[in-house]
Amino acid sequence: ELAKESGAKYLVDSHVDRVEGNEVILRNGSKHTAKIIVGAGGHNDPLRRDHWDESSLKIPVKFVLMEGDFGDAVELHFGSMAPGGYAWMFPKSSGANIGLGIQRSFSKGCSLNQYAEEFISKYDGEISFRGAGSLPMSGSIHTFVKGNYLLVGDAAGMVLPSNGAGITIAMVGGRIAGQVIAEHLSDGTPLAEYQHRWNKQMGKVMRNSKRAFRFGSLMFRLPNWMLNLTFNRLTKGIIWRAVTCRRMFWIL
């Protein structure tokens, strides 16, 4: 509502076909012109697809929303239950978000559907929603700005690889992008300032998260018993620091 009061116009059920110059062209043929164009359409954002050539690792995920009482504890499961990724159960007020993501290179011939159905079947409750997608897990891309184009959120890889968190990170990126765009239009602040401010505020967290993900990818190759031993007894402090995007070792 605040955006509408400031002059924003929402086009629901509209799909972007491509972006050319200062024009956004929709699938229905209509065109919209803008001084600055922001891509916030997720990892398959059309602006990134057409104007960025940087690739990123994407982990396929499946999840359900299940009704019931699941307590207050968050569950995270690693190892053969979700090869190269993790399975989760996030309690909500009247149910839970239950699902998993995997790296196909670790899956040993089994499909995402097989892993997801096996894990979800461990919980009792009525499923009210089923969803699927993928998470960009390479961390933020190197360049958020090209000319008058900007990327934010998943389109810019603003997901922490070590834990899959992206909502808060995207909100930070969106706030910085909005501030810089406003300053650019009012006093000519370079749009590249968006990247500079992001790196200053979130760069260290993202670098630590990328390191933790690489460390985790090595650990996931271990047998389950060794992985459990590592998580539960030997390096709890290190694992927690990895998940929370802090430096695990002084040498990393």
Kindly give the residue locations of the regions a language model identified.
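Hydrophobic transmembrane alpha-helix bundles
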Residues: 44-51, 55, 97-101, 163-173, ...
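Short flexible/disordered coil segments
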Residues: 73-81, 161, 166, 194-198, ...
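Flexible, glycine/charged-enriched surface loops at secondary-structure junctions
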Residues: 125-132, 189-192
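Conserved mid-domain beta->alpha element of the FAD-binding
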Residues: 140-206
